Amino acid sequence: MKLTCVLIVAVLFLTACQLTTAASYARSERQHPDLGSSDQNSKLTKRCLASGETCWRDTSCCSFSCTNNVCF
């Protein structure tokens, strides 16, 4: 019985610690958005390849159609 109570208290304590850490981390992200992932920013600036340009896979073309290394 005592062991069960100790385990329950320990789990509640660890859960509270994780919740406060997650909340402070989210608050920090909002205060400093420029410290976020640069990968996320680079995805916003990538351009797709126009029809007739050389490609290596379908996802790089605007039309998502890459045949014989040419976007269609």
From Swiss-Prot:
Propeptide: 23-45
Tagged with keyword Secreted: yes
GO cellular component: extracellular region
Disulfide bonds: 48-62, 55-66, 61-71
Keyword Nucleotidyltransferase attributed: no
Origin superkingdom: Eukaryota
GO molecular function, one term: ion channel inhibitor activity
Keywords per UniProt: Cleavage on pair of basic residues, Disulfide bond, Knottin, Neurotoxin, Secreted, Signal, Toxin
Pfam family of the protein (one): Conotoxin
InterPro entries: Conotoxin
Signal sequence coordinates: 1-22
Tissue specificity comment: Expressed by the venom duct.
Compartment(s): Secreted
Domain notes: The presence of a 'disulfide through disulfide knot' structurally defines this protein as a knottin.
Family of the protein in this entry: Belongs to the conotoxin O1 superfamily.
UniProt-recorded name of the protein: Conotoxin VnMKLT2-021
